[in-house]
C-alpha cells in the first residue's frame, strides 16, 4: 500500500510538471490532482493533456477542422454540408473528407471524457466476459495440450477464478490463446454514450452519433479492455499469493515431528526461559517461563516444572 502511494505521488509530480509546461494548469485542476488518490481517476484527469502521437484527430486539427467539429458538437447547424464546404481547402479534398476529420476530433473528445469512460467502466464491471480461443494452427503444438480447456472458453470476468485467469494469461503469453474482455452487449455502451453526447436527430446529431460509435469501437473499448485485463490479473495474482500464504501458514503450523507431543524452550537469563508444550496435533497445551539461571537461579523449581 505504501509503495503504491509513493508511486502515485511520483506520477502526480510528472503530470503536474507536464501540464504546467503546456501552460494549461488551473487552480481547480491542481486541486483535483492533489486530492486524487486513485490511479485510474488520475489518468483520466491527465488524458486530455497527455502528449499524443500523431492521431487521426491531431491530423484533422492540423487541417483546420476543429471549428467544424465544434459546430457539429453544438448540433444546431441545419445545413451541415454547406458549412463543411467552407473547410474544403488544402489537404481537405471534399465535404465528406471534412466531416470525417471533424468526426475524428469528436471521437477523441468522447474518449477523453471522464464521465464517458466511467460509464463504460461500470458496464464492464457488471457484464464483462472474458473469452479465450486457440490461435489458428497452434492447437496441435505440444505445449498447447495443457491449455485445451481454454481453446473455446467464455465466462463472466467477475466469476472467473484466479487459477483459471492466470492459466489463460499464461496461454496468451505463450502465443497459444487469443484473449479478449468485452461487455456482453456493446450496444449498451454505445447507447449510454449516445444519450450523453447526442441531442436531437438533425444532420449534426447523426454525425455525432457516428463519431460516438467510432470512439467506442476504436478508442474507448480497447483502452478499457486493457485496463480491466491489467486489473483482473493483479487481483488474480493477489489471490494466488493469498492462497499460497495460507497454505504455507498451515504447513508451518503443522506438528514439526509428526504425531508427537513436543516441548520447546526459548532460553533467556534475565527474562527467563520460555517453555511451550504442544500436543500431537500441534495445539498449544501449556506455556510459562522458568528461571534456572542467575539472577533468580531457580534450578530446582525449573527442573520440577520441566518434569511435570
Show where each model-derived region lies.
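Catalytic phosphate-handling regions of large nucleic-acid enzymes and associated NTPases
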Residues: 1
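Duplex nucleic acid-engaging cores and interfaces of nucleic-acid transaction enzymes
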Residues: 4, 8-14, 18-264, 270-308
Amino acid at each position: 500500500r505504501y509503495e503504491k502511494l509513493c508511486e502515485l505521488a511520483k506520477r502526480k509530480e510528472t503530470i503536474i510538471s507536464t501540464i504546467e509546461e503546456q501552460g494549461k494548469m488551473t487552480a481547480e485542476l491542481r486541486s483535483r490532482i492533489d486530492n486524487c488518490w486513485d490511479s485510474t481517476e488520475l489518468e483520466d484527469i491527465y488524458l486530455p493533456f497527455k502528449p499524443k502521437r500523431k492521431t487521426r484527430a491531431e491530423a484533422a486539427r492540423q487541417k483546420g477542422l476543429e471549428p467544424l467539429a465544434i459546430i457539429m458538437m453544438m448540433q444546431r447547424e441545419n445545413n451541415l454540408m454547406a458549412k463543411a464546404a467552407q473547410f474544403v481547402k488544402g489537404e481537405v479534398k471534399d465535404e465528406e473528407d471534412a466531416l470525417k476529420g471533424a468526426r475524428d476530433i469528436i471521437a477523441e473528445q468522447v474518449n477523453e471524457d471522464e464521465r464517458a469512460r466511467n460509464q463504460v467502466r461500470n458496464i464492464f464491471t457488471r457484464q464483462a466476459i472474458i473469452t479465450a480461443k486457440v490461435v489458428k494452427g497452434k492447437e496441435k503444438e505440444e505445449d498447447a495440450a495443457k491449455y485445451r480447456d481454454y481453446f473455446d472458453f467464455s465466462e463472466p470476468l467477475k466469476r472467473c477464478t484466479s487459477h483459471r485467469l492466470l492459466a489463460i494469461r499464461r496461454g496468451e503469453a505463450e502465443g497459444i490463446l487469443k484473449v479478449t474482455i468485452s461487455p456482453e452487449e456493446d450496444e449498451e455502451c454505445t447507447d449510454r454514450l449516445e444519450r450523453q453526447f447526442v441531442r436531437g436527430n438533425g444532420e449534426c446529431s447523426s454525425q455525432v452519433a457516428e463519431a460516438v460509435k467510432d470512439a467506442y469501437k476504436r478508442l474507448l473499448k480497447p483502452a478499457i479492455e486493457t485496463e480491466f485485463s491489467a486489473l483482473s490479473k493483479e487481483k488474480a495474482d493477489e489471490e494466488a499469493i493469498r492462497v499460497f500464504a495460507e497454505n504455507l501458514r498451515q504447513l508451518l503450523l503443522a506438528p514439526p515431528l509428526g504425531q508427537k507431543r513436543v516441548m520447546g524452550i526459548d532460553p533467556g537469563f534475565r527474562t527467563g526461559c520460555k517453555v511451550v508444550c504442544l500436543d500431537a496435533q500441534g495445539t498449544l497445551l501449556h506455556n510459562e517461563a522458568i528461571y534456572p539461571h542467575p539472577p533468580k537461579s531457580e534450578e530446582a523449581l525449573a527442573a520440577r516444572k520441566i518434569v511435570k
